[in-house]
């Protein structure tokens, strides 16, 4: 199916923070965008392009929940986008909690392209990060798109490892399903970093063994 995208930008070039409303593939999508003050309203050809970071919220959240991240963007001169997932989550795969089948990957690719059309972005410095379900979606990006330079997640899994959830969390299954995110299969590698707390009672660190095997391949 051909993907279409329509964009309404509110005060896009005159203020530091904007809400962007997309209609992508028939769905109304929302994203908050932060432009640091180091970027002038009309940057000339000599202006050095800046990095872009996408930050993904967890299950039950929305983009504006992560807006405190803007102080770091202001200090270090990079742009930040805070997309909102449909139904307050992301498409992490058929067995992921609270998931759906909306094409979030294509939406995020279109979002990056659209921001690039309006702002001086360094396409070699496009990053993504997320927490919990947002971290799971960040991990999923490593297997599904080449838009990003590097990825970082916290309190999350690579949910493709759990697409056969009903068969149990046996580490032997990890090797069988490594093809879901194997650089030899998808043709590229992706720098990644992940953080997880041992006292996390929502996303158990012990369940990450299968995910870790695949993550090591990235």
Task: Name what the model sees in each region.
Residues 3-13:
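Sec-dependent N-terminal signal peptides
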Residues 6, 20-22, 43, 69, ...:
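Residues embedded in well-ordered secondary-structure elements
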Residues 11, 87, 133, 158-159, ...:
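Residue-level marker for beta-strand->alpha-helix junctions and adjacent short loops that shape enzyme
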Residues 12-13, 67, 210:
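Alpha-helical transmembrane segments and their juxtamembrane interfaces
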Residues 15-17:
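Boundary at the C-terminal end of the N-terminal hydrophobic targeting segment
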Residues 22-38, 44-127, 131, 136-140, ...:
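Serine-hydrolase catalytic machinery in alpha/beta-hydrolase-like enzymes
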Residues 150, 155-218:
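The feature captures the conserved acid-bearing segment of alpha/beta-hydrolase catalytic domains
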């Amino acid at each position: 199916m051909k993907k279409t995208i329509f964009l309404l930008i509110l005060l896009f070039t005159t203020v530091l923070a904007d809400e962007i409303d997309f209609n992508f593939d028939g769905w109304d999508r929302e994203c908050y965008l932060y432009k640091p003050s180091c970027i002038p309203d009309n940057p000339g050809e000599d202006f050095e392009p800046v990095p872009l970071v996408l930050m993904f919220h967890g299950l039950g959240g929305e983009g504006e929940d992560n807006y405190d991240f803007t102080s770091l963007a202001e200090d270090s001169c990079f742009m930040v986008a805070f997309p909102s997932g449909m139904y307050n989550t992301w498409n992490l795969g058929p067995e992921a909690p609270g998931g759906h089948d909306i094409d979030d990957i294509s939406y995020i690719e279109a979002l990056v392209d659209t921001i690039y059309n309006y702002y001086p972005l360094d396409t070699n410095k496009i990053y993504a990060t997320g927490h919990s379900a947002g971290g799971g979606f960040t991990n999923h990006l490593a297997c599904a798109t080449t838009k990003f330079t590097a990825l970082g997640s916290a309190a999350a899994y690579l949910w493709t490892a759990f697409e056969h959830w009903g068969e149990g969390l046996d580490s032997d299954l990890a090797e069988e399903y490594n093809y879901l995110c194997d650089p030899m299969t998808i043709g590229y590698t992706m720098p990644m970093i992940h953080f997880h707390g041992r006292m996390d009672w929502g996303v158990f660190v012990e369940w990450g063994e299968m995910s870790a095997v695949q993550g090591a391949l990235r």
